Regions:
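Alpha/beta-hydrolase fold catalytic core
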Residues: 2-70, 93-95, 232, 312-313, ...
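Catalytic active-site module of serine/aspartate enzymes centered on a nucleophile-bearing elbow/loop
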Residues: 309, 317-359
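Flexible "cap/lid" subdomain of the alpha/beta-hydrolase fold that forms the substrate-access gate
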Residues: 117, 160, 164-310, 321, ...
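The conserved beta1-alpha1 loop
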Residues: 72-76, 142, 167, 284
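Conserved HGGG/HGGXW glycine-rich cap/lid loop of the alpha/beta-hydrolase fold
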Residues: 57, 61-107
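Conserved hydrolase catalytic core segment
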Residues: 134-180
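Active-site loop/oxyanion-hole signature of alpha/beta-hydrolase fold enzymes
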Residues: 59-61, 99-140, 156
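Alpha/beta-hydrolase active-site loop signature
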Residues: 78, 102-106, 145, 170, ...
């Protein structure tokens, strides 16, 4: 190859490298300026409290009447404490209630791995004690948070007066649902899980740092829908949720919980039932979105498994368990039907009496 051509190629490569570096620096500056602006727009909900080796964000409101339990809210995977915003304000009208950001979420520090339910439950216990928020508690959990509060109950049984599982995860759901799916769907879902794990663990923080995700959101191109972009939420809250999703620690935390999920499943199997504690299981009854690969019969079987089998099993975790189907809600009941959560949960606990507003 002629030397002039080699020199030209080398110059082109150097120029390309310089352009990429400048773009990366520009993206990082764009992200830093945007983050500074957002931090002023969206002040912290709650306060940071030292819980062992890390600081966690705890948001408590409402008064605690004598003899009443305090309500503690735990979110699903990928949802910060902000996901309870429509529930929190209503419960606070008649009870003391606290939501919190798990390690790496929202305004909380990242936590040590593996991010199993036992570790999460112990961190929550340390947080509540450090904040002076004493039991007994009514533990309310959405999705993956259900694992955490069930483990919490097994570790600290004297602290838990009652439980509300809002579309709580079931230890057998993946295995049982896979039995109903064709091989093509199983392969598709496995690839999607692997891709999402890589995005959260590696590409997610990089996209945040370079300002790529912010650019997508602010230009309206590819704005992600994480269940918190519902029209039920005011525009400012939707923007605040996207701001919290743009923190690099957030993607790492979601990925870490996902990697530790098999361990959490093993922990929940050992945790056992909930005894005779009052238990309400809220179940989304809205039909699943159609899947082009699945037949109507297969979709019906999946819905029946989810609503009438797995969730009913959860209700049987306690001798005083009750399932309530919310017919017009998706999995995101705290957003779609916060009133159902408020009514179910606030079953108020006073001197060993559980009164539910839902009959």
């Amino acid at each position: 190859m002629p030397r002039p051509l080699i020199a030209a190629i080398a110059k082109a490569i150097l120029l390309l490298d310089a352009i990429l570096i400048l773009l990366a620096l520009a993206g990082a500056a764009y992200q830093a300026l945007g983050r500074s602006r957002d931090a002023r727009r969206f002040p912290q909900h709650g306060r940071s409290i030292q819980a062992g080796r890390i600081k966690l964000n705890l948001d408590c409101t409402g008064d605690r009447s004598r003899g009443a339990a305090m309500v503690v809210l735990d979110s699903g995977s990928g949802v910060p404490a902000l996901g309870w915003i429509l529930v929190l304000s209503e419960v606070a009208k008649f009870a003391r209630v606290c939501s919190y950001d798990r390690a790496g979420y929202g305004w909380s520090d990242p936590g040590p791995e593996p991010r199993t339910s036992i570790k999460i439950a112990r961190e929550l216990k340390a947080l509540l004690e450090a904040a002076g928020e004493r039991g007994p508690y009514v533990m309310v959990a959405h999705s993956f948070g259900g694992f955490n509060v069930r483990v919490f109950t097994s570790l600290y049984p004297a602290d838990v007066a009652g439980v509300v599982l809002v579309e709580g995860s079931h230890e057998d759901e993946d295995q049982r649902m896979m039995q109903l799916l064709p091989a093509s769907v199983i392969e598709r879902e496995a690839k999607a899980d692997q891709r999402n794990e890589r995005i959260h663990r590696i590409m997610g923080p990089l996209r945040v740092w370079l300002g790529i995700q912010r650019l997508q959101i602010e230009t309206g191109w590819g704005t992600p829908d994480y269940g918190m972009q519902s029209s039920r939420l005011p525009k400012r809250l939707r923007e605040e949720f996207l701001y919290l999703r743009q923190q690099a620690n957030f993607g790492r935390a979601v990925a870490a919980e996902g990697r530790a999920f098999p361990q959490s499943v093993a922990e929940i199997r050992k945790a056992g039932g909930l005894g005779d504690r009052p238990l309400i299981v809220l179940t989304a009854g809205k039909p699943l979105d159609p899947d082009p690969i699945l037949t109507n019969e297969q979709m019906d079987k999946l819905e029946n498994l989810w609503i009438y089998d797995l969730r009913l099993q959860e209700a049987h975790l306690s001798t005083r368990g009750k399932q309530i189907i919310v017919p017009d809600s998706t999995h995101m009941i705290p957003i779609d039907r916060p009133d159902a959560v408020v009514s179910a949960r606030v079953p108020q606990w006073r001197r060993n009496r559980w009164t539910s507003a839902i009959r």
